[in-house]
Regions:
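Glycine-rich segments within core transmembrane alpha-helices of 12-TM secondary carriers
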Residues: 100-125, 329-340
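Helix-to-loop junctions at the C-terminal end of transmembrane segments
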Residues: 23-38, 247-261, 347
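A membrane-interface helix-boundary motif in multi-pass transporters
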Residues: 40, 125-139, 345-364
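Intracellular juxtamembrane helix-capping segments at the cytosolic ends
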Residues: 81-94, 302-316
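Juxtamembrane intracellular "pre-TM" segments in multi-pass secondary transporters
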Residues: 155-190
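Hydrophobic core of transmembrane alpha-helices in multi-pass small-molecule transporters
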Residues: 55-56, 66-82, 288-302
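A late C-terminal transmembrane helix in Major Facilitator Superfamily
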Residues: 319-349
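Structural signature of the two symmetry-related core transmembrane helices
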Residues: 41-57, 264-278
Length: 376
């Protein structure tokens, strides 16, 4: 049963990653070339919110893996329609002098939003049933597509802007990798590996909690559904991760000024993350999982900051920095797909979810090894 769950989840995740990557290239190009009275971004943002909401509602009604994978892919399309034009609108509307402040605000919003999403989701499961989280997510998607358009100044018409042709070559240009850039590829591999290490536990968290941490829930005499302790644990971990991430955001700057080489800072952070992983691996309990979330959230916050610095330092050509950084960000998707595949294979071979922790440790340590091999 465990292997079937893991394989089904891996299929859904990989499909979502592939569809998302293709959708990002297509939507970005189409949004840039949209010529209507409402502007280039507004129609896509509204449509993205609607598509995401409708597909999420349909996803909650599906029970077979093929349908779930298909609908999850369509949710990703809607999400890309919502977020890619929104990010472009930020870049176009925010003056350079305010951009650092806005970027920080967006980062804080993402951290808080992720935690809120978890809390709302688990509350919906406990108090409303299994379909309620999908309805809540659909409502949030709909609001996300409408509220920004109402709050922002009205976007000017794009009808008078020059028309530019779109070609397959132009779409594929997004996936063109930098050439003769060994250090860049090391940074890319390091990021992919650490993303895989993080994804191995977060992706399978529900299964880890229900099949490993609370596997003796009913034999211990408890009568309430296992979803109650699982949801409580996941909510507690979300809070711990948020606290750790905020702590990392405050300390990253001063530490980076004291130790100038980001390679060492990234490696130390990777080691700290493996220590966090070792806690539930050696002492599986709700307490160790919360400690893992707290320490891991702090460590990954540092890894994320210093990894970006390493990537920027490894760019082969300043003239193509924007394109190369966009390509570097594909490492997050590669890591997510790797986590799904490694996790599914590991669970299928061992028949349990405890293998995910040592597998994650190997990935994170491999990332540290690649990082330290980079030339400064």
């Amino acid at each position: 049963m465990a292997s079937a769950w893991a394989i089904d989840l891996a299929v859904v995740v990989v499909v979502g990653v592939v569809v998302s990557l293709i959708a990002e290239a297509v939507v970005s190009a189409l949004s840039d070339r949209t010529r209507v009275a409402a502007g280039r971004r507004t129609p896509w943002i509204i449509a993205g919110g609607v598509v995401s909401a409708v597909m999420t509602l349909a996803l909650g009604l599906c029970s077979n893996v093929v349908g779930i994978a298909l609908l999850w892919g369509l949710v990703q399309v809607g999400y890309v329609m919502l977020t890619v034009p929104m990010a472009a609108a930020f870049s176009e509307r925010v003056p350079d002098k305010f951009r650092p402040r806005i970027v920080r605000a967006r980062g804080i919003g993402q951290m808080v939003g992720q935690a809120l999403g978890v809390w709302i989701g688990v509350a919906c499961v406990v108090f409303g049933g299994l379909y309620t989280p999908f309805a809540a997510a659909a409502a949030v998607f709909l609001l996300a597509g409408i509220v920004p358009v109402l709050v922002w100044p009205k976007e000017p018409s794009s009808e008078e802007q020059p028309h530019t042709a779109m070609s397959a070559h132009m779409l594929m240009e997004r996936f063109r990798a930098p050439r003769h850039a060994v250090e860049f590829w090391k940074a890319f591999a390091s990021r992919s590996l650490v993303s895989a290490g993080v994804g191995l536990t977060t992706m399978f968290l529900w299964f880890i909690a229900s099949a490993l941490i609370f596997r003796d829930w009913f034999t211990q005499g408890n009568s309430s559904p296992i979803a109650v302790p699982v949801c409580s644990l996941i909510a507690s971990m979300a809070l711990a991760t948020l606290v750790g991430s905020v702590g990392a955001a405050f300390i990253a700057g001063p530490v980076g000024e004291y130790i100038e080489d980001p390679r060492y800072l990234s490696v130390i952070s990777c080691v700290l993350y493996t220590v966090a992983l070792a806690l539930p691996m050696t002492m599986p309990s709700a307490v160790s999982m919360v400690l893992f979330a707290l320490i891991g959230g702090f460590a990954f916050g540092l890894i994320d900051t210093f990894g970006q610095l390493l990537a920027m330092g490894a760019l082969p050509d300043a003239r193509s920095a924007g394109h190369d950084l966009a390509f570097f960000n594909l490492s997050n998707s590669v890591g997510l797909a790797l986590a799904a595949i490694i996790g599914a294979v590991g669970v299928a071979v061992t028949g349990g979810f405890s293998v995910l922790f040592p597998a994650a440790i190997v990935c994170v340590l491999a990332s540290a090894v690649v990082t330290i091999s980079m030339k400064r």
